[in-house]
Amino acid sequence: MAYVPLSGTNVRILADVPFSNDYKNTRWFTSSSNQYNWFNRKSRVYEMSKVTFMGFRENKPYVSVSLPIDKLYSASYIMFQNADYGNKWFYAFVTELEFKNSAVTYVHFEIDVLQTWMFDMKFQESFIVREHVKLWNDDGTPTINTIDEGLSYGSEYDIVSVENHKPYDDMMFLVIISKSIMHGTPGEEESRLNDINASLNGMPQPLCYYIHPFYKDGKVPKTYIGDNNANLSPIVNMLTNIFSQKSAVNDIVNMYVTDYIGLKLDYKNGDKELKLDKDMFEQAGIADDKHGNVDTIFVKKIPDYEALEIDTGDKWGGFTKDQESKLMMYPYCVTEITDFKGNHMNLKTEYINNSKLKIQVRGSLGVSNKVAYSVQDYNADSALSGGNRLTASLDSSLINNNPNDIAILNDYLSAYLQGNKNSLENQKSSILFNGIMGMIGGGISAGASAAGGSALGMASSVTGMTSTAGNAVLQMQAMQAKQADIANIPPQLTKMGGNTAFDYGNGYRGVYVIKKQLKAEYRRSLSSFFHKYGYKINRVKKPNLRTRKAFNYVQTKDCFISGDINNNDLQEIRTIFDNGITLWHTDNIGNYSVENELR
């Protein structure tokens, strides 16, 4: 219990002091004179010039007042001076009115240690559990505070914004892969038709690639290769003619549609105009002696792929701005990137180290569609260099590897590769995994049996044999031999396309940026809580005692407060701040509907 002086002078019993000894709230002052004037303006129930306090033996100090108890019902506070403390003003709560007789009342009290020692205590750096902090940066963006509050925020979100972003707006690409060249080259004396044309396409490879840009309505962009107009055929005409040519259709390995081929192309959506590098592409006319020519684009080489940047705008755009900036953080707000094809990722918007949400698009010309969408500067430290920042963005990527195949009539090899693509990949993964596990587990003993069997036999018993690294190599060779054997079987199968018609016909292209926010009911509930109690910060620092216009809430843990104060009172002050208290800077104490802006 706080120390009480033995006597007091200028004792004033006051009414209408709007806080109590539970120390949930108090009035905070900037000077002792302001403090004195504030209390001195309160209604006075009774005054005494000099008194000796009683009740110390019972640990219930009181002052005897020559008034009937009925006259003191409004008494809530006492202020007095003490000559032994240099006429310091002491402040105290009235805790009880005790009836002595019809003319005398004992007014019990306890010292208000906060008001009494407010200008004697010194707050040192302490562990601050929660307090009111700066909500918004100077540019209007929310300050970052992601410490878990442990509060319920519901299980559902409102979708507040949906945006679709595509690498080249409405333009997409049909990719045709063949085993050999399907076109002649104008101006060349000897035709390269049916020649194997190994080239650089991200890496050295033996296949031939053709691309055909088009729009959903079947039209094609005005396409220039260098300065020459490529005069591309409409996409339907191109498909009709190419499948009418036996030599061409039997040469095709795969066909698919993709949004991005791995190159930042010079494309103007408004003009529907595409410009291509003549060193990388050439016009290709595919024809035979029975069918007319169709014009498309042959890929000569692509030494390196490039990432395309899509600027989606302000990362906070679309969210409803709340009074409390923490409600802009995860999990109260979520940015989702999805393609509506089973690929999605949730982002914590505050960890995008940029004012804008920028998406990096990476693609390639492989044997099937594969496009990666990554968020630039997500979880990227500002100390990272530019190149490393781009690399770091790959850690948060959405990869669309839906086949997007076009239905083809082809030889057994292509149909087998397409129809069993997932199976083959799973076999390869299993073989490599088992090979590694065999090495770790001492599979060296299996080497003899691997050497004694044929490659094809090894492939047929993948699930039943002990796999070592050597076995893995033999099994891979066996599977490749199986594929090579199939290449000799004549055309006989029809390969149907996958979900390409559904995805593209319904407009599911590129990626969608979806902004989600808490349901309004939970936003209101959390907003009122944060308005009253501030945010968890869990930091060692000096507390914010007067940074807001109306009130500051402060809660500490094992706080460090010093000063020329007796130990009992000092310990009580520390306990008050550890329990949490609201420091009011206006007389409207307890009114949380007031605006509480930063000073």
UniProtKB/Swiss-Prot annotation:
Residue stretches spanning the membrane: none
GO biological process, one term: symbiont genome entry into host cell via pore formation in plasma membrane
Subunit structure: Homohexamer; forms a hexameric tube structure with six flexible hydrophobic loops.
Top-level taxon in the UniProt lineage: Viruses
Intracellular or extracellular location(s): Virion
A GO cellular component annotation in the UniProt record: virus tail, tube
Free-text function comment from the UniProt entry: Distal (knob) tail protein that plugs the end of the tube before DNA ejection and forms a channel perforating the host membrane during ejection.
Pfam families: Caud_tail_N, phi29_gp9_C
Xref: InterPro entries: Gp9_C (IPR048710), Gp9_N (IPR031772)
Keyword annotations from UniProtKB, A to Z: Late protein, Pore-mediated penetration of viral genome into host cell, Viral genome ejection through host cell envelope, Viral penetration into host cytoplasm, Viral short tail ejection system, Viral tail protein, Viral tail tube protein, Virion, Virus entry into host cell
Protein name: Tail knob protein gp9
